[in-house]
Every structure is written in structure tokens, then in C-alpha cells.
Amino acid sequence: MAEFIKLPVGIENFEKIRRDGFYYVDKTGLIEQLLNNWGEVNLFTRPRRFGKTLNMSMFKCFFEIGTDQSLFEGLYISKNKALCDAYMGKYPVISISLKGVNADSYENARSLLKRIVMEEAKMHRIIMSGNRLDDIDKAEYMSLVTGDMGEDTLVYSMKTLTALLEKYYEKKVIVLIDEYDVPLAKANENG
């Protein structure tokens, strides 16, 4: 009996798909296109269910410091050694999804957004080590991790986290925001 490759139904995590041997349509050429047509901000618009979330996960896996480069073995992008040497695993990455911010009120949306910020900030605990950040920076970071955020802190939370990561790593930060339109759609729906 022939062995079948598993289909990744409902799986939007690039690392899981590659590690667990799921069928994967190689879209790593998008990384090359992105880098060859670099912009300060890049917006990817496609209809629902066109793989945007999986592509965001792929971008994170490619760019993030400490990435497992074996995830890309045998894929299109691995043939471009110069590009991989220059960019793979070289950047701090903030990756959030606003899919869960589907609240029916401002207060509930704020609470959900705060949770997303807290979870992402926790992913970067390494910045508390060493002396690259001063005590004020570390206190700002801890306010993001603990959720001890006033309105202004929450509004500027991504900018703050980006600045702290940039200071710690001395590199530009890649920020990936998936489902960015969900809070806007819910706000429009609920007035």
C-alpha cells in the first residue's frame, strides 16, 4: 500500500508542517520577492483562506534570530545561499495575530489586545539579561509582560517593544501583524 503524505488541514504553523512531515506547497519564493522589493511596510492582501497566516509563520521562521535553518532544507529559498546567509535567522521578530480581538465593546477589545501584547512580550524575555537595557527600559518591558499598562502604554506597546528589541539586538526589528483588520471589522459591526 502506498504511503500518503499528511495534509495540513487547519494547520497554519510553518514549523509544525515542516517538522511533522505534512504536505507543503513551497512558497518560500515569497521571501526572495519580499527582500528584492523591500519596503518599510509591506501589506499582503488576499482573500480568506489563501495562506496569509501560514506565510506569516514562514516569514517568522526564516528571519527570527535562532531559527532552525533545517526547516528550509530542500525548499526554493535554500538554493539562494547568499540571501540565506544575509537574512536567515538574523532579526528579532515580533509576530502577533489580532484574530482574537473580536470583542463587542471597546473595553473587551482593549483587554484582549493587552493579552496579545503580554504574550508576545513574554516571548522576548532574553532582553532582560545583560546590560544592554537600562533599568528604565527593563521597567518598561516588565509593564508589557505583566499587563500593568495604562491607555498610553498599551497604545504605544508595539512601538515600545520594537524599540527595546532594537536596542538589545542592535538590529532593525521585523513586525508581522496577522488579521490586522479583525478589530476594525468588529468595531464597525458593533458601533
Residue ranges and their predicted role:
Residues 37-38, 89-90, 169-171:
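Short loop/turn elements that form and flank the Walker-type P-loop nucleotide-binding site
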Residues 33, 46, 50, 54-62, ...:
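Alpha-helical scaffold elements adjacent to nucleotide-binding pockets in ATP/GTP-utilizing enzyme cores
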Residues 9-18, 101, 108, 112-155, ...:
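Conserved P-loop NTPase mechanochemical-coupling segment
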Residues 178-182:
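Walker B catalytic acidic pair
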Residues 151-172:
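Conserved helicase/translocase P-loop NTPase motor core
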Residues 1-80:
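Walker A/P-loop-proximal flanking segment of P-loop NTPase domains
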Residues 10, 15, 26, 61-126:
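P-loop NTPase motor core
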